[in-house]
Swiss-Prot record:
Pfam families: UbiA (PF01040). It is an enzyme of class 2 (transferase). This is Protoheme IX farnesyltransferase. The gene is cyoE. Keywords: Cell inner membrane, Cell membrane, Heme biosynthesis, Membrane, Transferase, Transmembrane, Transmembrane helix. The lineage of its organism: Bacteria, Pseudomonadati, Pseudomonadota, Gammaproteobacteria, Enterobacterales. One of its GO terms (biological process) is heme O biosynthetic process.
Length: 296
């Protein structure tokens, strides 16, 4: 039973979701020439760092998790793992993941993992989530780190492709997270978490969702327009973006915001998975514009 609890506290669903985006970034950069030991090491390294961040987040959020319906049965809330032990566990996971990325990939991949981790645990979980309506925006940067780590593990440099991936996944996080905040509105309100729907209202949030999906649409197309992905990717990116935008616009006429937001949330996962798969298989061999280079 203890193994199950130690697994649950790492939030396996979040790890799996992040792995799909890591694979997308890695295979996009590989352009068909896959280094399998590096591929597996990168997946494991990112998994360990994400798991570490999730355990720290569970530790930090114990007080609010017990208030929220969705989180009241979490392992640390129920006292199934000693909080001090969870901190040691999280630290070991994080250090192992970062060292693996440094040794197996390069310094840039490790540095991106450190930055994503610090933003998620230090800036978002410890402060912004509880204090600011902009918490979601800050958190989106850490959520966009995994595909960029996957990409830079291959290239060893932060180029235009890495920047576009950062934009795509950051912009995707916003409607995805706002949809959760709408259908979990009462939970966030009860826990006094200042998400946009609670602070500004659901109608304002719908406007933000629409604008972010429009920006996401432009960012997804940039991957092909800049020569990184092919036209099959472009067709799928355009199709899922337009469909997602249509769903967002239907929200203005929705009679039940919670049901609408849940559908929008589910489709957001389909959308980002589709893009990750397409960039994995429809890549272009392209000479990258280097913005920032680190020797791996």
């Amino acid at each position: 039973m203890m193994i199950k609890q130690y697994l649950q506290v790492t939030k396996p669903g979040i790890i799996f979701g992040n792995l799909i985006s890591v694979i997308g970034g890695f295979l996009l950069a590989s352009k068909g020439d896959i280094d399998y030991p590096l591929f597996l090491s990168t997946l494991l390294g990112v998994s360990l760092v994400v798991a570490s961040g999730c355990v720290f987040n569970n530790y930090i959020d114990r007080d609010i998790d017990k208030i929220m319906e969705r989180t009241k049965n979490r392992v640390l809330v129920k006292g199934l793992i000693d909080p001090k032990v969870s901190l040691i566990y999280a630290s070991v996971l994080g250090i192992a993941g970062m060292l693996l990325l440094y040794v197996a990939a390069n310094a840039l991949a490790m540095m991106l993992a450190v930055i994503g981790f610090v933003i998620y645990v230090g800036v978002y979980s410890l402060y912004m989530k509880r204090k600011s309506v902009y918490g979601t925006l800050i958190g989106s940067l850490s959520g966009a780190a995994p595909p960029v780590i996957g990409y830079c593990a291959v290239t060893g440099q932060f180029d235009t492709g890495a920047l576009i991936l950062l934009l795509i996944f950051s912009l995707w996080q916003m409607p995805h997270s706002y949809a959760i905040a709408i259908f979990r509105f009462k939970d966030y309100q009860a826990a006094n978490i200042p998400v946009l729907p609670v602070i500004k209202g659901i109608s304002v949030t719908k406007n933000h969702i629409t604008l972010y999906i429009l920006a996401f649409m432009v960012a997804t197309l940039m991957l092909t327009l800049s020569g990184y992905a092919g036209y099959k990717y472009l067709v799928v990116a355009a199709a899922v973006s337009v469909w997602w935008l249509g769903m967002a616009l239907r929200g203005y006429k929705a009679t039940n915001d919670s049901v609408w937001a849940r559908k929008l949330f589910v489709f957001s996962i389909i959308a980002i998975t589709s893009l990750s798969v397409m960039m994995s298989v429809d890549f272009n061999v392209h000479s990258s514009a280097v913005l920032l280079t680190y020797a791996g």
